[in-house]
Amino acid sequence: VTGGDAANEAYLQKFCGYTLLANRPEQIILFLIGDGGDGKSVFIETIKHVLGDYQATLAATSISSSKKSSIPNDIAKLRGKRLATISELPKDLHVDTQMVKGISGGDTQTARFLHQEYFDLDPHAQLLIATNFYPYANPEDKAYFRRVEIMRFPVCFTDKQPDKHLAQTLR
């Protein structure tokens, strides 16, 4: 998936290792970017399988600046999680950098499940976002961009004979 780039392979291993820890050694928002058919989804599904109940999937709207809710209930599902994944961002999505920094920064957030009481959430999840397009974010938000890591998935497997059972094999 990395096209043989040893540095990217090592970084993916380090990131996966971070998801095994109860604390968060670094504030990282990892974007996996590629044109499709490049292994992003297989990689994410594999790490989600390994982590089991320690991972959660968020909708792309969770980090959208057009979201209307003042206290989002979707981040409540991050309680006790070590990995939060988001897949397939729309091309025109504008990132709510405050929300993303809140998830990735480790500061206590106010959260609630739908129709339930508010509670304090101390997010520990690493944020992993797979997309074909890098979303727009306020270019002046230095704290957001300090956290962002971009990893390109340059190999397209649809040009070759793809292993249709690879996801199952990796489990």
Name each region found by the language model.
Residues V1-R79, E149-M151:
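P-loop NTPase catalytic core of nucleic-acid-dependent motor ATPases
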Residues R24-Q27, K77-A84, L127, F153-H165:
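Short acidic (Asp/Glu) and glycine-rich catalytic loops that position anionic groups and cofactors
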Residues T57-I71, Q98-E117, Q161-L170:
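Substrate-gripping "pore-loop 1 plus following alpha2 helix"
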Residues N73-G80, A111-A130:
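AAA+/SF3 P-loop NTPase mechanochemical coupling elements
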Residues G80-G106, F119, A137-Y144:
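Conserved AAA+/SF3 P-loop NTPase catalytic/coupling segment centered on the Walker-B
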Residues S87, L128, V148:
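Hydrophobic, well-ordered secondary-structure elements that form the walls
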Residues P90-K91, N132-Y136, P154-D159:
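Conserved nucleotide-binding/hydrolysis micro-motifs of P-loop NTPases
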Residues L121-A125, E140-R171:
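Phosphate-sensing "switch" segment of ASCE/P-loop ATPases
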